């Protein structure tokens, strides 16, 4: 998170959402990135080069605060689908049905959009970076990564975005907010696809998963992670070692460990405040284990629905709000929203402050246990995952 005070630029790591937009928009190259051991980046400011123009501050998504009034009012009226690729092989190999990649490819092929900014696979850590695709540069399924459960600075390559009539932006809510700040002169119309997100992960989360598998992430970061694929909910792999994702997610995601610090100041998991037309998420609790996979799609706008209907490679099964409500995590999103002021240091109800303090204490304790002890039997991790969630108990 960047602030400009009396022409002096300052950076707060604990509120940084790791999008990389500040690095990309700086006209004087006064901002550089320094990789940390946990896979995140520190933002370094060269005061001698900084001209205090404020572009980085205006683009920073962490500086955008919302009240979230009425956020949940329209969910009962929205359209919902379980979506998946028509080809079962592709469906199985994707994170959860292959909807996101297929949206990008089909929308470019059928002319629904002229350009799309998303991610591409790379050979070195973090194994993904931002990429601009066009109707002349349509990616294959293998060009784009499956879900990546360590932080990727998705907005560092925005200079690749060329002017076009209709632009698709794909990313989490914070990434969409960052991209919104720079697209004014890039296109006539924008279609936004939000990847539902309550928490991004540091590389320490992957280190823990590797430990569970009986391997490790090498210090030089020359390894190959694959976080999803092979049906629903899929398999996590690190250099040939593997673990069912349902087990792998219990500690990092279930207990919110190794979370990017700036995630605490974002309660817009669906990207609605960023203007999302559709949101893609995993169908937890409403879909059982299967060999193929599907994505839960929440439609926010008619434009988003039209985009979906034009994707000939997708199968879309309509669902009612009552059918999908358990998977939407609305209660958990509410918890993020009410605790956001406490994470920002703003005045709020004492109960919310108490919940954040309890959450931090529990996270520190659990991290100490699982990081300091040697590899434990799976049953021990499952037991830890079932410990009462102190934050949620306070925020019943």
At which residue positions do the language-model features occur?
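Iron-sulfur cluster-binding cysteine motifs and their immediate structural context
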Residues: 2, 15-17, 21-42, 55-74, ...
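Generic beta-sheet signal
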Residues: 165-171, 190
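Short, surface-exposed basic-aromatic patches at helix termini and helix-loop junctions that form
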Residues: 180-191, 210-214
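Gly/Ser/Thr-rich loops at beta-strand to alpha-helix junctions
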Residues: 94-99, 123, 169-179, 199-201
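Short, intrinsically disordered, charge-biased short linear motifs at domain edges
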Residues: 2-6, 10-13, 44-48, 246-254
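Long, compositionally biased charged/polar accessory segments in the mid-to-C-terminal portions
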Residues: 113-114, 213-396
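Flanking helices and flexible, charged tails adjoining ferredoxin-like Fe-S electron-transfer domains
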Residues: 1-6, 49-163, 326-344, 352-358
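Short, flexible loop segments at boundaries between secondary-structure elements
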Residues: 191-212, 326
